[in-house]
Structures are given as structure tokens and as C-alpha cells.
Amino acid sequence: MRSAKQGLGGVVLLIGSLGLGAGDVMAIEESRYTVVEQVDNFELRRYEPGIVAETLVEGDFSDVGNEGFRRLAGYIFGDNRKQQDIDMTAPVSQESASEKIAMTAPVSQQTAGGKWRITFIMPAGYTMETLPVPLDDRVVLKQEPGRLMAAIRYSGTWGRERYQEKEASLRVFAAEQGLKIVGEPVFARYNAPFTLWFLRRNEVLIPVERVQQP
């Protein structure tokens, strides 16, 4: 096993101005995970519990990120009861939150108008009691449990077609490893829109659990 850092990002479609260039990612705090297994460019990761700020946005995959980011960025940049700034973390994450589709359904089955969950992981050291309360009632704080996640990392564009291609590959990997998919796929972006496409860090993650052998 080896340790690494990363944000779950339950997505994202982003983003107005993260302030992250190609070389800035590692300077930003990320949520913590341990790599349990690695096969080629696939990883099985165990994420530690954490707190996220989340907002639900209704719309198409390619459109919801900007709105979600604006709400969450407003919160961490002082739109809260303490008027307190909170350090930026990475990545921003996005996943389906549609009530019409089972949790194991792929994003490719989502329809326009579905709900998407956009999240920022909160920096280590905060608790639910010490984080400032959001002024925007569309932003809520939630405790995220630790999770086992299958992951694939890639560079390139943020288009839906490429995301679905990587998601499909990750599902094949999970099946080959005897893993049961237990939640929605998550799209994580680590860079600002102005970062050159070939320097971007993108990830698709899927919650999984090991299948008990009879």
C-alpha cells in the first residue's frame, strides 16, 4: 500500500476561475486516500471520512458546473455567517443526484433536467461545529463517510463523451476485479479552465465494495 492525497470531489463541471494552473494542483489541500491496489492506470482507493460543502444543480452534464461552482465558491470566499474565508481544496466533484434513476445507473442514462451534486471537500481541521454556516440555503455541509473507490486518472478535455469513455473503462476494471458498484460515478476536475487540455488532471471514481466469496 502507499498513501496519497486526493479530493473526491463528488465533480465537476466547472468552473469559472479556480485559480489553479497546471503546476498549482499539489499546493492545494486534497482529501486523503490510500491506494489499495493499482493496475495500469486504474486504482482502488480507500478514502478517509471528511466534510463537504454541497449543492444540487438541475440541468445537463455540461451546464451545471458553473452554477454549482459559483454557489460553493461564494461560501468559501466569505458568504457565510462568520464572513470567514476557507482555503480552496481540490478537486471539485460532480455526480448524479437524480431521484429518478437508481444509484447504480451510469451517467450516460441521465436525462436533461436531472439533478447533479457538486461538492468541495472542506480542509482538514474543521468539524461540523467549527465550519461557518452558509448564507445561501442551497449550500449545505455534510459528513462524508469513508469509501472504497475505483478510480481512473486521465488528461484531456472535459467533454461528456470522453468522461463516458473513461467511466465505461472503469466499470470494466471493477467487474474484472470482482468489485460490486454501489453508487454513482463521480467526475473530479483539478484544474482551472485556462489550463491546457494536455496538462489537466481529471478523474472518474466509482464507489465499490468487495464481493464476499461464498
Q: What are the functions of these language-model segments?
A:
Residues 2-214:
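A solvent-exposed interaction/effector surface
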